[in-house]
Amino acid sequence: MKEQEIQENMNKSIEATQRNFNTIRTGRANASLLDRISVEYYGAETPIKSLATISTVDSQTISIQPFDISCLQAIEKSISMSDLGITPNNDGKVIRINVPPLTEERRKEFCKLASKYAEEGKVALRNIRRDAVDKEKKDEKDGLISIDESRDNQSEIQKITNKFIALIETKLSEKEKEILKV
């Protein structure tokens, strides 16, 4: 694998980890909280952001304005059934969600969830590293590159992996600070 290809794959893993982090509640209203929620709409699971305009009114309130009023109840039901622990208020045209402050216990749960997402990201990075190292070993075995080149390349792959793992650790600590901030 080329160095650039490895970095591209690792960047995709970092982006996926960041998307997971964005779905964790922090006690502040954030439209990305609803990214993982899908609505049963005309027989198909559809993301809320495809059915409505989602905006944050203030630090505690999210507003959802459906493009089609007929899906208002379905959106409300999907939010209620989600694991976010928030209750939508439907006024007939717009759904408002008041995001209550998190309890200490809930904050700790979300920190554990963030750690889990970070670990999944690190595992993905290690899998990319393993595939790249295996390719280097195969090229060495097939005589395409020398033992020294193979070891140098493997060392470089490890350095890249360490850099990306440190990036995930940084993002995790930022997310934990955000979650624990009262």
From Swiss-Prot:
Keywords assigned by UniProt, alphabetized: Cytoplasm, Protein biosynthesis
Keyword Protein biosynthesis in record: yes
Disulfide feature: none
Assigned GO CC terms: cytoplasm
InterPro entries in UniProt: Ribosome_recyc_fac, Ribosome_recyc_fac_dom, RRF_sf
Protein's cellular compartments: Cytoplasm
Xref: SUPFAM superfamilies: Ribosome recycling factor, RRF
Highest taxon above the source species: Bacteria
Keyword Cytoplasm assigned: yes
GO biological process: translational termination
Main subcellular location: cytoplasm
Recorded GO MF terms: ribosomal large subunit binding
Entries under Pfam families matching the protein: RRF
Function: Responsible for the release of ribosomes from messenger RNA at the termination of protein biosynthesis. May increase the efficiency of translation by recycling ribosomes from one round of translation to another.
NCBIfam families membership: frr (TIGR00496)
Protein family according to the UniProt entry: Belongs to the RRF family.
Name this protein carries in UniProt: Ribosome-recycling factor
Lineage: Bacteria, Bacillati, Cyanobacteriota, Cyanophyceae, Synechococcales
